[in-house]
Amino acid sequence: MQEESKILKFKFAVGEVFNDLRIKNENISINKLAMEYEIDKGSLSKIERGVYDCRLSTAWRIAQANGVSFSDFAKLLEEKLGKDFTFIDL
């Protein structure tokens, strides 16, 4: 898999996991989540759509805002990507 397509797959998976968490979090709106946890609404929307590659600190904050630890978010992301996903071809 080309590096660019791996990055796209990763960004879409991050967005899907965050969207799933937000929906499970009493179906909280992006606006409410952004306002309550001081996360930029536009960035949050772009992250959920998979068009923005967020910083690690932002991902951590979004995970916590959705009621999960960062490590649990990482596990969900790994499950979404599949065990054989890697950025580095060995």
Annotate each predicted stretch with a short phrase.
Residues 1-27:
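A short, Lys/Arg-rich alpha-helix, primarily the initiator
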Residues 1-5, 74-90:
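Short, charged recognition helix plus adjacent turn
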Residues 22, 34, 63:
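The alpha-helix within a helix-turn-helix
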Residues 25-46:
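Short alpha-helical DNA-recognition segment
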Residues 49:
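Short, conserved catalytic or interaction motifs in soluble domains
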Residues 57-72:
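DNA major-groove recognition helix of helix-turn-helix/homeodomain DNA-binding modules
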